[in-house]
From Swiss-Prot:
Similarity-based family: Belongs to the universal ribosomal protein uL1 family.
Protein name: Large ribosomal subunit protein uL1
Subunit structure: Part of the 50S ribosomal subunit.
The keyword rRNA-binding appears for this protein: yes
UniProt keyword Nucleus, yes or no: no
GO cellular component labels: cytosolic large ribosomal subunit
Amino acid sequence: MAKLTKRMRNIREKVEVTKEYDINEAVALLKELATAKFTESVDVAVNLGIDARKSDQNVRGATVLPHGTGRDIRVAVFTQGANAEAAKEAGADLVGMEDLAELVKKGEMNFDVVVASPDAMRVVGQLGTILGPRGLMPNPKVGTVTPNVAEAVKNAKAGQVRYRNDKNGIIHTTIGKVDFDAAQLKENLEALLVALKKAKPTSAKGTFVKKVSISTTMGAGVSLDQATLNTQTN
């Protein structure tokens, strides 16, 4: 039988697996248990009441978190003309068309998000086998194929998170870093949950957000009491 590490023993002692924690209590617990030698991310898993086998019940989109994710995001933009200048002014790290495509083909992909204007998709479309498996292919559903590339760049830089349910109907994404204060993490999580509720498929029946749990990069998941979150949609 594998020997438990000191870290895992500590987690087992502190985390009650059947308990739904108040958000502030949960964040305090994650901070206490985050002992890695780097600043861990705070990740969230949201179990949705959908049938992921049905295409009309899949949930996909993007939202800007009010306090960002704590990451420096590098953005590559496929566009030309006036849009290229607008993208650069908005803070894009790489801007181009065929020249940028050549870098991608060579494996030089020093970026986290790819944005494209509609007229550039003839170039980007040829890169699907490279960008697709890495989750980098631009898509209008998450706002990365758009005529307004400058806004897309600003959103990405401001801490936009993209979300998509997996085959089990669960959304996995990040809501910040463990060194964020509790209020920032709470507001980021609430913003994400509001966005998810607005994206609820019309064909999904019953309780939509079934379970919410948060964890750090190296830590265990902590289930949340949703009553301690303000996720009312207008």
